[in-house]
Amino acid sequence: MFSIQQPLLVFSDLDGTLLDSHSYDWQPAAPWLSRLHEANIPVILCSSKTSAEMLYLQKMLGLQGLPLIAENGAVIQLAEQWQDIDGFPRIISGISHGEICQVLNKLREKEHFKFTTFDDVDDATIAEWTGLSRSQAALTQLHEASVTLIWRDSDEHMAQFIARLNELGLQFMQGARFWHVLDASAGKDQAANWIIATYQQLSGRRPTTLGLGDGPNDAPLLEVMDYAVIVKGLNREGVHLHDEDPARVWRTQREGPEGWREGLDHFFSAR
């Protein structure tokens, strides 16, 4: 399929993909992370998490200095060596976190939708919801261009809520455990395409791309990849792509980082 010697970018979701959904362990993927690092193949993290959370995790994973995609594509953290690019160190897409909060508060007040955002609670509550430490939970509240929430209303009201958001230029995106509100123009796919184009411009050659994800919000990212790994996940809706050619897409039997490793094993040994 491809070799570790060719120009390659690996885009990876975090929770439920590279990280275990419950323990946040990534050790089953560690050998591949080391191998990719030694081959100078960037592993670009893509998540609904804030850039503050992701920079912390990026360092723990040994991926510091690489670009990353935060808040479902609404934020792009640039690579350390891209200091000449406009917007360094981060590019923010569309409506800001504060503006989205204002919209949500008005909708909740006037139309009585029931939901709880991360801005409504303290870090201790988020730590309880997520299993994170309080210091890590505090990083989850540092949104720049999205809002994370728990939906506490009916499916019928959700449809009305989504329609209202769309009218206001916003989208409602489902993650592994929470829902996210962000600018309608933002997305993991747009952010990934921007990063791919930047690498192509700098190297003079378009790199081959491999994406890994486990949730519905990863589908746009995986659609624009040359090859995709759909890691077996907890979400009942799963991931469905328009092009699921077995030569391009691999669905893992294992979950989390074990599935991540399985996907890398498949594509690097398939040819």
From Swiss-Prot:
Q: Which cofactor does it need?
A: Mg(2+)
Q: Which domain of life is it from?
A: Bacteria
Q: Where is the active site?
A: D13
Alphabetical GO biological process terms: mannosylglycerate biosynthetic process
Where is this gene product found? Cytoplasm
Q: Which reactions appear under catalytic activity for this entry?
A: 2-O-(alpha-D-mannosyl)-3-phosphoglycerate + H2O = (2R)-2-O-(alpha-D-mannosyl)-glycerate + phosphate
| Molecular function via GO | magnesium ion binding; mannosyl-3-phosphoglycerate phosphatase activity
- Coarse class of the primary localization is cytoplasm
Q: Tell me the keywords, alphabetical order.
A: Cytoplasm, Hydrolase, Magnesium, Metal-binding
Q: Which family, according to UniProt?
A: Belongs to the HAD-like hydrolase superfamily. MPGP family.
Q: What is this protein called?
A: Mannosyl-3-phosphoglycerate phosphatase
Question: Origin organism of this chain?
Answer: Escherichia coli O6:H1 (strain CFT073 / ATCC 700928 / UPEC)
Q: Which gene encodes it?
A: yedP
